[in-house]
Amino acid sequence: MSRTTRQTRTSLPRVVARKPRRGDVHPLTPAAIRQILAALPVEQLHGLRRIELRARVDDVGDPFALYRREEQDILLYSLPPDEWWMSSLDRACARELRRAGARIVRHRHGVSIHFAGGGMDLFMRDVLAHEIGHHVRNQVARYPRTARTADEEAVADLHARRTRVRLRDDA
């Protein structure tokens, strides 16, 4: 008989917090991310190595987050704390922002997004769930990917909706 003890609970992916861009914040803390991950089925996290909070490099939402298939990690980018300016905003993103409580104001040269209370946290929880959806899709796929980008995004959105319901039920 082996003297090693098997771990019955699968460990969560590592959460790494880097400094946000100057003037930005990370809406989700590492502790909040761990709490979200702990509420998800272990199968969804299988193979996910790391979630990293990172400074955004470019404009807000370009992108909000990124799943890197080869590295099996998720990058969540920093955001301005009060008001975001974006040159454009597609309908799906606007719908998700409004659902999280954002007020969207259209201007001549772009769009401003304003959050009150914990709305930005709710939005980033959905973004994280969407990226986990990409991870789940890539874990299940046995053959080379042939799906179009629109199909990949639809699967990730479906996963985000299911995760949102699961997290709401656990709260």
Stretches with model-predicted labels:
Residues 29, 125, 152:
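Hydrophobic (often cysteine-bearing) scaffold residues that line and stabilize catalytic clefts
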Residues 117-121, 126:
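Basic amphipathic recognition helices
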Residues 1-117:
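A metal-dependent hydrolase signature that marks the N-terminal structural subdomain at the beginning
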